[in-house]
Amino acid sequence: MSFLSERTKGYIIMKKILYLTDLSYKAKGRNYSEEDIYITDKLKNKYDVVLCHPKCAVSYEDYADIVVFRNTGSVIGYKDIYFDFLKRVSEKKLKTFNSFDGKADMKGKQYLLELTAEKYPVIPTIDSVDDISILPKSDLFVIKPKDGADSIGLDFVTLEEINGRNICPGTMLIQPAIDFQYEVSFYFIDDKFEYALYAPDKSKRWILKEYNCTDEDIAFARRFIEWNTVTHGIQRVDACRTNDGELLLVELEDLNPYLSILDVNEKIRHKFLNDMMETLEML
């Protein structure tokens, strides 16, 4: 039984792509379904593409040449299914985009502690109150679940409140509350810088505009791409610009970063999709 229609019979056979997405996933200011429909509409000009939820991937992945893991939402909602999928990727040597060999968000938030210890320009992060001396002095701190996503469970607290919560070591991330000018995100395919977007209004962080970054800004973001071990795929470097003008890493999303691709101009989109397809052709 064919994975797709027989429309390619007698013609050049297209690569078959299983595009994993959750078209019903809701997030404030982000239209996951619209973005993935746009991308797959472009991909179908060169590939046979089928979209499905990660929960259904096992039924189709053996028939695909490449499995593209995109806007699937937080894997916390289907953790066992996700880990079973990763096991099959390893055992069957499935070709995937992204590759699942990164050490940032796809492995959890431990990397923020590692980058802090390695003195990278990152918001200082600990996961135990016993290490509070590592952090710069602050009147207010941010705490959030170490295995959380989408700001679920995030809270702003004082040091006194932290000490009164009996936080179990290793369960919560603790950071100083950083006063910043704006947030900015840098988007890469493999090691290629694609574009940058920023939120000029801190109270409306989901409203993004194209950001004209400097060579120094790109070099900042590239440090984290080079630190990471993703062989191929899309990565998003999220940072904040402090009031002193310094960039600090907020998050390195290397699993399924939302791209805000519809917020950039057509020329940037065209280059992004061409670079994405160039990588897919090499798999």
Region locations from a protein language model:
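Phosphate-binding site of ATP-dependent enzymes
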Residues: I152-I234, D238-L248
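A short beta-strand motif that forms the metal-chelation/ATP-contact edge
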Residues: A64-F69, K144, F186-F188, Y195, ...
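Conserved anion/nucleotide-ligand pocket segment
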Residues: S138-T158
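C-terminal active-site "lid" helix and adjoining low-complexity regulatory extension at the edge
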Residues: R241-L283
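Conserved N-proximal alpha/beta basic substrate-recognition cap immediately N-terminal to
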Residues: L23-P124, S128
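Short amphipathic alpha-helix with an adjacent loop that forms part of the alpha/beta core around
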Residues: C56-Y63, I132-K137, N163-R165
